[in-house]
From Swiss-Prot:
Protein name as catalogued: Cyclic AMP receptor 3
Major subcellular location class: membrane
Family as reported in the entry's similarity comment: Belongs to the G-protein coupled receptor 5 family.
Segments on the Extracellular face: 1-23, 79-94, 151-173, 236-246
Length: 490
């Protein structure tokens, strides 16, 4: 912002008129891009219900704070051309910078703590910390702003009003000191989280290491953005304290610090496939009116509620998973039909959905459901279902009812498989949606899906599944033959 006049501003900053004009233009560009980025994130969170969870609440508060700060700053930059030290506009500008920046930093720290709490500590109720977050993120900046206003240290400092160049102690005590402390704590929390997930990755037998490295990057990219956007601000203030005012450092300070909201928004969008598919499908709509990107827009539109990674077309992994899933369903149906022919003679058989067991036991999501205290993996469900059915095996009436239900379920499974095959044929561009509760945190918000090794260490997942089904067949046949022998002896 141009304050007082060009000559006095240049004298205060040590920059020429051309350098000061360039800094002013950079400031406006940074303000507008930050406003656009935060608005897009808030729009996406408002429109996409799958993104409404504890983590995205924190991101929403960060973007809301940054948006309010940038809006007020932009208005003051555009309308207040001639300010003087001690004016209301000058004090307002300084307060907006101090309060808004500190609040954004603290929300970033809360985001780091929440991710650590969810992944490492497996906190079942992360929402209980939100009230403390609000007190922490709103009260601390307020205290710092009140101290700044009460000390009379606000002056015109170039493109904005803030703590004067001669008050280096107040600058670092009220602003850059807390910044360094917040960044250090956030980096420690992210480091502990990354170390934990890295150990899980190393202990797995998954070959998909590249994808896991992508998840690792998503855990730390927002803290990298946090550092890069403010590192030149720290450098510039240290240099200013030495009575030096290099123009290029000041311009980088202006652009990056004001653009923190924009780059943080880009990071949040990148970490959420749901978000960028939704936004990309909207952005491409005008181009489709002229015949451009029609197929791409249609694919993004179909997959905008899909939390998988590849937005355009069906990836090879997705195709293999679809083929494997359909093969398992067909195998299970044949297996269930064979079981139903012997249910009257064999009451000890337990009907299980092997494909669900395989899917749930091989993939674990580090997500905490809103209504459940702990996430239960597929293997636990498998055991619980088996135990509950074993408890009912001694009742003849329940056996007859179970046989009828099994027959109906098999018919439904056959119909569902036919429908699935038709859907896969007709919707080749739609990727399979992850098998997760919609109330749980989307995996790509915090990038923490870790594959669990197969139950048998020497078999592939496909062989493990076949072994499960073959063992069930053998157990059923052996039991059936033993029952026949008992009947013949009688």
């Amino acid at each position: 912002m141009e304050n007082l006049n060009t000559t006095s501003t240049a004298a205060l900053t040590g920059m020429t008129k051309q350098e000061n004009d360039a800094s002013y233009a950079v400031l406006l560009i940074a303000d507008f891009t930050s406003i656009i980025g935060c608005t897009l994130v808030l729009l996406g969170f408002w429109r996409l219900k799958l993104l409404r969870n504890h983590i995205t609440k924190i991101i929403t508060f960060f973007c809301s704070t940054s948006l309010a700060k940038d809006l007020i700053s932009t208005i003051l930059t555009l309308i207040e051309k001639k300010q003087s030290n001690g004016s209301f506009q000058c004090y307002l500008y300084a307060t907006v910078i101090t309060y808004g920046s500190l609040a954004c930093w603290l929300w970033t720290l809360c985001l780091s703590f929440s991710i650590y709490n969810l992944i490492v500590k497996r906190e079942p109720e992360p929402e209980k910390f939100e009230k403390y977050y609000h007190v922490f993120c709103w009260v601390v900046p307020f205290i710092m702003s009140v101290i700044m206003l009460s000390k009379g240290v606000i002056e015109v400092t170039g493109n904005w009003c803030w703590i004067g160049n001669t008050y280096v102690g107040y600058r670092f005590g009220l602003f850059y000191g807390p910044f360094l402390a917040i960044w250090f704590l956030a980096a420690v929390l992210v480091g502990l989280t990354s170390r934990y997930t890295y150990k899980v990755i190393r202990s797995s037998v998954s070959d998909n290491k590249d994808r896991h490295m992508t998840y690792q990057f998503k855990l730390i990219n927002y803290i990298i953005v946090f550092l890069l956007c403010w590192v030149f601000a720290v450098i510039n203030r240290i240099v200013n304290g030495l009575n030096m005012f290099p123009a290029w450092v000041s311009i980088l300070h202006t652009y990056l610090s004001v653009s923190h909201g924009f780059y943080a928004s880009v990071t949040f969008i990148y970490n959420n496939p749901l978000m960028w598919r939704y936004l990309a499908s909207i952005i491409l709509i005008p181009f489709t009116k002229f015949g451009y990107f029609v197929e791409t827009q249609q694919r993004l539109e179909k997959n905008k509620n899909n939390n998988n990674h590849s937005p355009v077309g069906l990836s090879n992994n997705a195709q293999n998973n679809n083929h494997h899933h359909n093969h398992n369903n067909n195998h299970n149906n044949n297996h269930n039909n064979h079981n139903n022919n012997n249910n009257n003679n064999n009451s000890d058989f337990v009907n299980n959905d092997s494909s669900n067991y395989y899917t749930a036991s091989m993939i674990e999501s580090f997500s905490v459901q809103n209504e459940n205290s702990k996430s239960i993996n597929g293997a636990d469900n498998f055991k619980q279902n088996g135990a509950s059915q074993q408890d009912d095996k001694d009742s003849p009436n329940s056996n007859n009812n179970n046989n009828n239900n099994n027959n109906n379920n098999n018919n439904n499974n056959n119909n569902n498989n036919n429908n699935n095959n038709n859907n896969n044929y007709n919707n080749k561009d739609i990727e399979p949606i992850d098998n997760c509760n919609t109330n749980s945190i989307p995996m790509d918000n915090i990038a923490t899906r870790i594959e669990i090794p197969p139950q048998h260490p020497t078999l592939t997942p496909q062989q493990s599944l076949q072994e499960i089904n073959l063992n069930d067949d053998d157990n059923k046949i052996n039991t059936h033959q033993s029952n026949k022998k008992k009947d013949s002896n009688v």
